[in-house]
């Protein structure tokens, strides 16, 4: 199945950074209300994911959906170089907002692993060097990485969740996606809630309710955020 609509799929990159972790470094157990991808570029690390410890090495890719608790530490005599990417405004067909269809955080990319890691290193270079248009270049690479992740989850993986939304929720998801698309492409114009609702053939009250449930913002506050 196709998880994305090219016209409306437009994730927001919250951060992309690549820390060097020395022995003794650790993070407390935490979770996010957005997507996070963690990639082991070099070295090894000890991760705790939903209460289960895992030793991970070079090439390991973990994708933490919202609410997935995780922590990490560096054992004595070890180090790691990791890339962490935070993403929001991610909408995939049949799934709750900001969720990917993986059952487990630890991913097996199979034949896509080499291409994925090559792009991860390029993302690291773009965000570290910050040359002209690095954010655009970085976003393009991250979109390709997301495409590879989705392909790996579709190709016979036992780590793939089935669509979790009802037909009503799917219709609401499409409505929110098109509202977001319209706001992002007309943000310089004067737009009222009534005008937006008219464009989408729904009532202002209904649009406002489902938009805020999906994004945490009202349509007009989202427009202000985009501006």
Annotated model-derived regions:
Residues 1-61, 68, 74-76, 93-106:
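Generic protein-terminus/edge-of-domain signal
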Residues 33, 172, 176, 224:
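Short, conserved glycine- and acidic-residue-centered signature motifs
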Residues 77-95:
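A short hydrophobic beta-strand segment most commonly corresponding to one strand
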Residues 98-156, 181:
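Amphipathic alpha-helical segments enriched in hydrophobic/aromatic residues interleaved with Lys/Arg
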Residues 133-138, 168-174, 188:
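Cytosolic nucleotide-utilizing catalytic cores of signal-transduction proteins
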Residues 159-167, 215:
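Short, Lys/Arg-enriched N-terminal segment that forms or immediately precedes the first helix
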Residues 178, 182-226:
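Basic/polar phosphate-binding segments, predominantly the helix-turn-helix DNA-binding elements
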């Amino acid at each position: 199945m196709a998880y994305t609509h090219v016209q409306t799929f437009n994730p927001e990159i919250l951060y992309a950074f690549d820390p060097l972790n020395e022995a003794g470094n650790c993070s407390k157990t935490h979770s996010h209300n957005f997507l996070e991808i963690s990639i082991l570029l070099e070295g090894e690390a000890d991760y705790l994911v939903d209460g289960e410890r895992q030793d991970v090495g070079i090439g390991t890719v973990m994708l933490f959906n919202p609410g997935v608790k995780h922590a990490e530490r560096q054992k004595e005599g070890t180090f790691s170089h990791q890339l962490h990417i935070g993403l929001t405004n991610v909408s995939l067909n049949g799934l709750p907002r900001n969720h990917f269809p993986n059952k487990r955080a630890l991913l097996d990319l199979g034949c896509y692993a080499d291409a994925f890691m090559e792009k991860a290193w390029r993302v690291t270079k773009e965000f570290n060097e910050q040359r002209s248009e690095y954010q655009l270049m970085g976003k393009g690479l991250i979109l390709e990485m997301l495409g590879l992740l989705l392909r790996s989850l579709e190709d016979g993986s036992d780590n793939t969740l089935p669509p979790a939304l009802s037909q009503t929720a799917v219709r609401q998801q499409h409505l929110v996606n098109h509202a977001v698309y319209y706001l992002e492409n007309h943000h310089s114009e004067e737009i009222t809630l009534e005008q937006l609702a008219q464009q989408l053939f729904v009532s202002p009250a209904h649009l406002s309710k489902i938009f805020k449930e999906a994004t945490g913002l009202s349509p007009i506050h989202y427009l202000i955020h985009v501006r």
